[in-house]
């Protein structure tokens, strides 16, 4: 079990680390996303497959 706390901005690899955790705690100002997908790239740390798992 892994607990992650996201505060501020979690883009790219930072968001993928959040996706691999069991529980995510964040405030209302948390801005998280995979920016690689917007430019047509595939993320390298398995974040895309973790989103659909």
Curated annotation (Swiss-Prot):
Record-linked InterPro entries: ClpP/crotonase-like_dom_sf
Name this polypeptide is given: Putative uncharacterized protein RC0837
Native organism: Rickettsia conorii (strain ATCC VR-613 / Malish 7)
């Amino acid at each position: 079990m892994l607990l992650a706390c996201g505060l501020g901005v979690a883009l790219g690899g930072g968001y993928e680390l959040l996706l691999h955790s069991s529980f995510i705690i964040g405030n209302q100002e948390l801005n998280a996303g995979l920016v690689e997908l917007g430019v047509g790239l595939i993320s390298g740390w398995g974040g895309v497959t973790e989103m659909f798992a």
